[in-house]
């Protein structure tokens, strides 16, 4: 077998392979034997059909099978022998073949780039340092109380955390607009559900009052015809209700987990907060590392790998919005190409970090990660056992752990500064 490899544009390569005639003929004879064993021809018993008839009937198909198999086999022999880092599927073009002669073909394909990491020492990472305080715990307890809150009607003026029932009619330049009108609309204030200025305009008014609120729709508002427009809402305030928070009793505490006292509840809450905080900090640092790698290493990526990632993103989009799987192909590829390219680049860069640092998965850390995940459930032991019985899930955790190890390897060379931050600051800036 003779080969020649050419470098085309970018990451494209072309290999020309010639397979010796005797190898093709040997494969051809084996194919005919296979056909002969199963051929059914009138006047002959199965497996006893003369060779000349088998060749006459099946010779062309047998040659095509052999040539197709040899292209696949010979190409991947080249990939292994030449240590080609193949990306995607090759395109085969066979040359004209005459029985008894050598067979040659051309395979065109893409390769993954050879990544040489640069600028790790230029990557800047700000690492928040957070201590969960008693005030943080108090806020979280209040969140739980608000989840169990009731409301009591009042004749007092509406406050920022009250619940109100209103009728409203919105208009722009004196004309009502679609979706700007509602009756008996119940609004829990202080949750940011309405556009800026709307809830603030209700505060201070009492049930039975009618008044107008002047607001400006945000520039990024979803309705194109309302972006940045000044609007007026005519409001009828029909009911004001004060929020009534439940007392911190044993009965209240028992609604949340296994805690029996307020102190036990606070301990459980703190554990959950610590777990959420750890995940948020890990994600924030990882994102900075990845952004730094991308900024310092502008690598070319195979179009085939990007296309595969586009398909993954399409499927995820369909699943997210509850569509049917066959709808994925209808989504325009250009919607996902930027993110797909970024994902491929990130994968290649992290793989290079892993390879250059000779990183191996820390199995103890894998077990710790699974235990941490399990601790969020009522029956942690069952979750751990479930992972043990599902190798694919465990492999996913291994990939996560190895990626974390890669991030830490970059951090060891990057410029890392610590910054004192609060729990709320970190949790409000996720993503």
UniProtKB/Swiss-Prot annotation:
GO annotation, cellular component aspect: cytoplasm
EC number assigned by the record: 5.2.1.8
Alphabetized UniProt keyword annotations: Cell cycle, Cell division, Chaperone, Cytoplasm, Isomerase, Rotamase
Compartments (UniProt record): Cytoplasm
Key word Cytoplasm present: yes
Keyword Mitochondrion: no
Principal localisation: cytoplasm
One function term, GO molecular function aspect: protein folding chaperone
Signal peptide interval: none
BP term (GO), one: 'de novo' cotranslational protein folding
Catalytic activity: [protein]-peptidylproline (omega=180) = [protein]-peptidylproline (omega=0)
Domain PPIase FKBP-type: 161-246
Entries under SUPFAM superfamilies matching the protein: FKBP-like, Triger factor/SurA peptide-binding domain-like, Trigger factor ribosome-binding domain
HAMAP family: Trigger_factor_Tig
Annotated function: Involved in protein export. Acts as a chaperone by maintaining the newly synthesized protein in an open conformation. Functions as a peptidyl-prolyl cis-trans isomerase.
Homology family: Belongs to the FKBP-type PPIase family. Tig subfamily.
Annotated domain remarks: Consists of 3 domains; the N-terminus binds the ribosome, the middle domain has PPIase activity, while the C-terminus has intrinsic chaperone activity on its own.
Annotated protein name in UniProt: Trigger factor
Record gene name: tig
């Amino acid at each position: 077998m003779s080969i020649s490899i050419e470098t085309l544009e970018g990451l494209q390569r072309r290999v020309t392979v010639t397979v010796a005639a005797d190898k093709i003929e040997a494969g051809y004879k084996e194919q005919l034997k296979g056909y002969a064993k199963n051929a059914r021809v009138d006047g002959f018993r199965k497996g006893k059909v003369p060779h000349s008839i088998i060749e006459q009937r099946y010779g062309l198909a047998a040659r095509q099978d052999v040539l197709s198999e040899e292209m696949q086999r010979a190409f991947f022999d080249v990939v292994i022998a030449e240590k080609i880092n193949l990306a995607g599927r090759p395109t085969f073009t066979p040359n004209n073949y005459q029985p008894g002669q050598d067979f040659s073909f051309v395979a065109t394909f893409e390769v993954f780039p050879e990544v040489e990491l640069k600028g790790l020492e230029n990557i800047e990472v700000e690492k928040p340092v957070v201590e969960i305080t008693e005030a943080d715990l108090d806020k979280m307890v209040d969140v739980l109380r608000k989840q169990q809150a009731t409301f009591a009607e009042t004749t007092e003026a509406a406050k920022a955390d009250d619940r109100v029932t209103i009728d409203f009619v919105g208009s722009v330049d004196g004309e009502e607009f679609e979706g700007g009108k509602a009756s008996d609309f119940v609004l829990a204030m202080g949750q940011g559900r309405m556009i800026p200025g709307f809830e603030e305009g209700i505060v201070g008014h009492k049930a039975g009052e009618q008044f107008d609120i002047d607001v400006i729709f945000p520039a990024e508002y979803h309705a194109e015809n309302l972006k940045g427009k000044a609007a007026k809402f005519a409001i009828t305030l029909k009911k004001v209700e004060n929020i009534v928070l439940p007392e911190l009793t044993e009965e209240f505490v028992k609604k949340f987990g296994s805690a029996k006292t307020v102190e036990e509840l606070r301990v459980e809450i703190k554990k959950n907060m610590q777990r959420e905080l750890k995940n948020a900090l890990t994600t924030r640092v990882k994102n900075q590392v990845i952004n730094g790698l991308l900024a310092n290493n502008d690598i070319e990526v195979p179009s085939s790998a990007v296309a595969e990632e586009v398909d993954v993103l399409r499927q995820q989009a369909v699943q997210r919005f509850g569509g049917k799987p066959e709808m994925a192909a209808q989504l325009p590829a250009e919607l996902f190409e930027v993110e797909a390219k970024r994902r491929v680049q990130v994968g290649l860069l992290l793989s290079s970090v892993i390879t250059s640092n000779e990183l191996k998965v820390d199995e103890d850390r894998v077990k710790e990660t699974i235990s941490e995940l399990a601790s969020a459930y009522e029956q942690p032991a069952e979750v751990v056992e479930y992972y043990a019985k599902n190798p694919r899930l465990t492999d996913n955790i291994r990939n996560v752990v190895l990626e974390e190890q890669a991030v830490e390897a970059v951090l060891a060379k990057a410029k890392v500064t610590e910054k004192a931050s609060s729990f709320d600051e970190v949790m409000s800036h996720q993503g």
